[in-house]
Amino acid sequence: MAARALLLASGPAAGPGLGRFAYALVPPLMQAVWGLSYAEAGFLGSANTLGYFLGALSSPLVLGRVGYRLGFYGALLLQGPVLALTGTGYLPALLLRFVQGVLGAWIFVGGAALLMALGRSGRALGAYYGGVGLGLLLGPWLLLAVQDPAVAWARLGLGAGALGLFALPALPLLQEPPPPVRGKGDLGPVRALLWAYGLYGAGYIGYMTFVTTAVGDWALLFGLLGVGALFTGLFWGPWVERVGGRRGLVHVLFLLFL
């Protein structure tokens, strides 16, 4: 299971890692070459966030209909072309950032569901989620010495495409998750959790969009973020398995607050 988790981890590396968070490396180039304002750069981030939100909401329906394996690998292999075409201009970028958000959500949710179908393992899930850190680590190296946004997006697309190919050996080893059990309850018990998670998302999206404009050595910053995301997943997975999901989430959010 560990080997399959590591192979599937290339999904979060390509989707949320390179496709979503590495976007923060590109706004300075787009501002210099395209003349983008902070508001326009923020709209690109908002389009991506909206796409991710709608992709996450639609994941059970879409992935359940087409199959989790087809949905995961299809979205993963589309990451490369979508990212590569993002550098063609502002209006295409606005649409493609939305599309990438949808695809990134299907990758993240689909891969986790496929991994959980093999058996519940906090360590394996931690390794899978840590794949985001690999994308953060690769982003600065892919963009070394790049001065043109089109070249930057092409390199990110190439990196995402390579990561997608890396996940292919796991395909014959995976099985479809069982159909979800439909409940009749309301959202009352989890409403506070949804608000907390929404506020957390609103905070870190703004931070990850504009952090490179405030920090000079963004390669070092993303390296530290990548290492942290890559290895803390291996810690948090077993910890949440030990203390339970509710307490584990409280512990994670408390440390983020500090």
Per-region residue spans from a language model:
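Symmetry-related core transmembrane helices of the 12-TM Major Facilitator Superfamily/SLC fold
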Residues: 153-172
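Conserved MFS/SLC helix-loop-helix module at the cytosolic interface between two early adjacent transmembrane helices
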Residues: 54-87
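A gly/Pro-rich, aromatic-decorated transmembrane alpha-helix motif that marks the paired
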Residues: 57-58, 128-149
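C-terminal transmembrane helical hairpin of 12-TM major facilitator-type secondary transporters
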Residues: 246-258
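Cytoplasmic helix-loop-helix junction between adjacent transmembrane helices
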Residues: 96-131
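Extracytoplasmic
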Residues: 11-30, 207-212
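Central cavity-lining transmembrane alpha-helices of secondary-active solute carriers
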Residues: 46-60, 223-235
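Extracytoplasmic gate region of multi-pass secondary transporters
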Residues: 23-24, 190-223, 229
